[in-house]
Amino acid sequence: MQSPQLRFLPVSGPAARDGGVRRMAFWDWSADPEAQGRHVVICVHGLSRQGRDFDVLAQALTPRSRVLAVDVAGRGYSDWLADPMAYQLGNYVADLAALVLQMRAEVPDAAIDWVGTSMGGLIGMAIAAQPALAPRRLVLNDVGPVIEWPALQRIGDYLGLNPSFASEQDAVAYLASISTGFGPHSPAQWLAFSRPMLRERDGRWWLHYDPAIAQPYKAMTTGMEEVAARQFVQDGERTLWALYDAIGVPTLLLRGADSDLLTRATASEMGQRGPRARCVEFAGVGHAPTLLAPDQVAVVQEFLWAA
């Protein structure tokens, strides 16, 4: 099996916790030498995940594409932030904009596409709404301008708990228990999908992210009165719809048929305004499709390679 190269991009903005130059990690799946650089796919994960989530998709794309799977700040091998309240979407967008500009500097004629799961899709919407940064094609995986409040609360129940486990098996079982929305997977798939989420220290297994990523999130979902929090979410939805309506590139929307975060009504509206995303639903899946199943991979592959 092909393995990616772990690379780092120095980024500005919020300081790193260790006081040095902050670095954003990304996994570089290089394409065939003859196709190198001509088609780049940037993949960005969900709120508490990391770039190796895209291993299966990347291996399917690398015959014709170079895939860059990012560890967003505070996740995986990217630096942790000195200020926990800096774990905000705007800072993530700035970091990813730096990567887009770096790729365009390295390969000026490259076609750059974007695949974003959940939070990675929100970052992608903000990038795609800016003509100077917009990808050629955009894939939004189970996310849109309207994010359902119960889903936010569900995620807030486990985000940042920082549990540790006596064995890798126990850690994998825990991750599976909080990820039932991902749909059915074999034990081997759960293990492969979970291993990059873990790190071993002092004989225990820990989640491979900064628990402090939860602080801004919990300030919204548990730190406000419900009325104020809901108003905050509604204001955010207006902003996200404005971003979505500004997108002018072909857009594919993936949705788990049982998703509690992206409703069918929101998906339908996304097909009628802005880039008029084409929606593909996957039965037996909630939030969010993992892009491990062959049918999920094929839909993305066909969309990105269509041009």
Report each predicted region and the residues it spans.
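Conserved HGGG/HGGXW glycine-rich cap/lid loop of the alpha/beta-hydrolase fold
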Residues: 28-80
